[in-house]
Structure formats: structure tokens, C-alpha cells
């Protein structure tokens, strides 16, 4: 399949739904969100796109703010996961790294590149793992 980005950091999926690409069977449109910044208003935009038949894939999300840092908003994150599961939308969390920021899945003190355990994960990493 082909993933197609949408305007405004892959948030304007409702705009893409107004004029989708024609003649292709293997296209999905990307949606990005950070639960600390993007709430129900962005889910409403996604719902409008879904209502028009636009296939969506979340190719980047986190539960920090949009900077990739700040506090984790697990309440809003859970609302997003419920929305994605209800609408059968697949998703990828950002970011599989050990950078010292809220959106890193691996603790900054961890240097190994494989065979991580729950002890190696950040709070965000453990939260995301619990969703699978």
C-alpha cells in the first residue's frame, strides 16, 4: 500500500476526503496526533474523513504534547486508542529511541539496541506496550 500524507502535519484528513486521489486501490491517508495537544477536535476531523470513506492510518502518534515533550496525557491517549480500535485504524507510536524526551519509548539510560524489557521502557513505552 501507499501512505499519503495530508496537510498540516497530517491532520487535515477531512480536507483530503473532499478531494481524494482517484483510480487507486492501495492508498491510505496518514493521520498524526499527540494526545497532549490534539483532542476531540482532531478525532472529529478524522471521523468526517472516515464518514466519506477515506482509509486512514496513524503513522505517528504520542501521548506527550506535539513538541514530543511535556507531560503524558494518558486520559486523552486512551480516548484516542478507543477511537482507533472502534474504527479499525492501525497506528504507530513515536518514537523508538532513547532520547531524553517524553515521546521516547526507551529510557535514555538504556544503550542496548534489542531485547528490551519493561524495565528499559519509559512510562510512554510501557503505556503503548499495554495497548497491544
Go through each PLM region and give its residues:
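Extracellular glycoside hydrolase catalytic/binding regions
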Residues: 1-90, 94-98, 103-131
